[in-house]
Amino acid sequence: MTPVGPAVRGEAPVTLREIRVAFFRNLNLGQARSHSPTSSQLLDAFVEAGARAPSHVGTNGTVVYYHSTGPTLVRRVAKLLTPMCGYHDMVTVRSGSALIELHRRLRGLRDGEVILYDTTPGFDPPTPIESDDGLIVISLDHRRAITQHRLGSRPTAAGPFIASLVGVPTTTRSITTMRRVADRVREYAGA
């Protein structure tokens, strides 16, 4: 058994910064054609990598867990998943505090999408940006974009549009899903 630190063992207090959320791209639990793990394979990989109390929110590769460091653990998880089921795609991680702040930013918005990625700090183009078919990017920085769409329009998917703007792979969740993720983070924090 690999030794783990005190925060992972539950011997230290947990803060919002120790609550992490991993967002996997193109991971749909139990879907073999997308080389996705089952629920138990995914959660077991998190535990084996050193996370404490992982749980997924829905079936789209969103996992909330306790760990004192950020992306290091999810890189280990991704390496464990590759031989297990063939999954090999982008994953990004955010702290619990970042998710609570994002939830505040989503207040009052109708359903749209949140697109997550990692680029160089300082990337902060002016918004709003509107596509020809009615997709409106209302917020965009080096780690995430928030989109809506013009009423009555049927815009293309936000993920590819944002990926073309930021130049890196992205993963997308609906605003409704992100609200559920923030609720799970609050549960983990005991708030």
Predicted regions and their residues:
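N-terminal amphipathic/basic-hydrophobic helices that include classical n-h-c signal peptides
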Residues: 1-15
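Surface-exposed, charge/polar-rich loops and edge strands
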Residues: 13-60, 64-191
